[in-house]
Regions:
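Hydrophobic transmembrane alpha-helices of multi-pass small-molecule transporters
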Residues: 73-76, 188-192, 217-222, 293-296, ...
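Transmembrane helical elements of multi-pass membrane transporters/channels
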Residues: 29-48, 150, 184, 213-217, ...
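Helix-terminus/linker motif at the lipid-water interface of multi-pass membrane proteins
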Residues: 39, 43-62, 131-138, 194-201, ...
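Short runs within selected transmembrane alpha-helices of multi-pass transporters and secretion channels
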Residues: 82, 151-169, 177-185, 206-219, ...
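Short alpha-helical transmembrane segments in multi-pass integral membrane proteins
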Residues: 1-31, 89-156, 198-253, 309-374, ...
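Transmembrane alpha-helix boundary and packing residues in multipass membrane permease domains
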Residues: 34, 38, 50, 87, ...
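Small-residue-rich hydrophobic transmembrane alpha-helices
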Residues: 61-121, 158-177, 283-347, 378-400
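N-terminal transmembrane alpha-helices
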Residues: 18-50, 54-55, 69-84, 88, ...
Length: 458
């Protein structure tokens, strides 16, 4: 329920109080560590591909490319589900009701543990089936299944990391998750070099390094949480299903479902590309790693926007929440245009960082040419989505995401993939096309919501 309160509720720590002060520096200060964490996460995934591309086989490169798509689906869905925890914690801080946060965390621990157990069974025991459904090239099928199975065995660490990061971001602390990812990235680089370059374990070595890195980062996160001075208390009795579970799931489930179908569309896209051959598959995998870097600023804006907006909505300051969205769009457009120019003009050079295979580089660059406008379009879309997430309009976020995925991106990518002499450029163009539709939908909903709230508060 939206309140039309005029007063501001202040938090004890000015750095984590988003309800007062200039928006741009506050948002930038909170966003930068999130951006840093995302940069390291992208580097984390890129290192696997880079090391396997240099010291492994082309089949191993395809296996990591396809297998990482599966793991990305799981990770992104868990992240969106955890967004419910972030938003609810930030809301309680804004409303000055921290006594409920312990129940949120305890309930979340139970829910995410059950989720991790289910994912473990699926990824470990059905790895080969999943790889087959992804239409992994025959020569890379065994390596892909091995990669998925090994990473699936460490899914508890991946889920735990995302839940703990959501907790810290909800408290307005975006620096601690940055430290966790930095530790994981260092461990992963060392592991890749030892297992892939040293012991020549190919895709399996990259998977083992990934699991080890996640385990170390979770240990660091728990240690930091125990030492941190928290504005609330956690009791043993909080670790059970409780009324707060329904609340954060009500926020997070629509986002998780939307993200699941979005990532499923990218898995389908990966399958479409895999049918075009090993070189196209490997080229698409390289392009996806570059895309991950290109999307960093819009993604960090979306994550930071949710906490920023949620605090202000909780404090009854809707105008400031709207202003933060427009500030985020401005930041995103500045960087989005620069990234577009880099990807469009130097996509082949960027692709060459991951492999020396000329055919793979050419396929990667072809996809990037179609995808490039997405770097500008998402600057607008992701800031709006972050605003709606923080404003507890996650059901709408799910609806607009499904329209983009099911009615635009997936049909267009499929149609382009079955054309004679199918072009990776046209397949890549399905992403910015669907985002443009999403922007139009969100603008219409924003205008409608603003009119509705004004009438309600009149």
């Amino acid at each position: 329920m939206l309140l039309c309160a005029k007063g501001k509720i202040l938090l004890k720590n000015d750095k984590t109080d988003f309800t007062q002060g200039r928006i741009l520096p506050k948002l930038a200060f909170f966003m930068l560590p999130i951006l840093g964490a995302l940069v390291l996460q992208a580097a984390y995934g890129a290192v696997d591909l880079l090391v396997v591309g240099r010291f492994g086989s082309t089949s191993g490169l395809s296996a990591v490319s396809t297998g990482s798509q599966v793991l990305n689906l799981v990770t992104f869905v868990v992240t969106q589900l955890a967004m419910g925890v972030t938003v609810l914690i930030a809301r309680y801080l804004g409303e000055k009701r921290p006594q409920y946060i312990g129940q949120v965390i305890g309930g979340a621990a139970v829910v995410f543990t059950l989720l991790a157990a289910a994912l473990f069974v699926v990824l470990v025991f059905f790895a080969r089936l999943i790889s087959s459904l992804m239409q992994a090239p025959a020569e890379a099928l065994d390596l892909t299944a091995s990669y998925v199975r090994i990473c699936g065995s460490g899914i508890f660490f991946i889920v735990a990391y995302n839940m703990l990061s959501a907790l810290f971001r909800g408290l307005g602390d975006s620096r601690s998750p940055l430290i966790f990812v930095l530790v994981a990235c260092i461990v992963n680089v060392i592991g890749d070099l030892v297992l892939v370059a040293g012991f020549h374990l190919d895709a399996a070595g990259a998977a083992i390094a990934t699991v080890a890195a996640q385990a170390v980062s979770v240990i660091c996160a728990i240690a930091m949480l125990l030492k941190k001075e928290l504005p609330f208390k956690i009791h043993r009795s909080d670790f059970k299903p409780n009324p707060q579970c329904k609340k954060f799931l009500g926020i997070g489930l629509p986002l998780a479902l939307q993200e699941f179908l979005t990532q499923l569309s990218f898995l389908a896209l990966c399958a479409f590309v895999n049918r075009l051959g090993l070189e196209a598959s490997s080229g698409y995998g390289v392009a996806c790693k570059i895309v991950n870097f290109a999307m960093l600023i819009p993604s960090s804006l979306m994550q930071s926007m949710a906490s920023f907006v949620s605090q202000n909505v909780g404090a009854g300051n809707k105008k400031r929440a709207e202003q933060s969205m427009f500030t985020g769009i401005g930041i995103g457009l500045v960087f989005g245009c620069a990234v577009f120019a880099l990807v469009w003009c130097k996509g082949d050079v960027l692709s060459g960082l991951f492999t020396a295979d000329a055919a793979v580089i050419a396929n990667s660059y072809a996809y990037l040419m179609g995808f490039a406008p997405e770097t500008i379009a998402t600057a607008i879309l992701f800031s709006m989505v972050g605003y709606f997430n923080g404003n507890d309009k996650t059901l709408w976020v799910m609806v607009q995401g499904l329209v983009q995925t099911l009615l635009v991106r997936l049909p267009m990518a499929y149609i382009m993939s079955i054309q004679p002499n199918a072009s990776l450029t046209m397949i890549g163009l399905s992403a910015p096309t669907s985002t443009a539709v999403g922007i139009l939908l969100n603008i219409c909903f924003f205008l409608w919501l603003k009119r509705y709230e004004n009438q309600t508060c009149a």
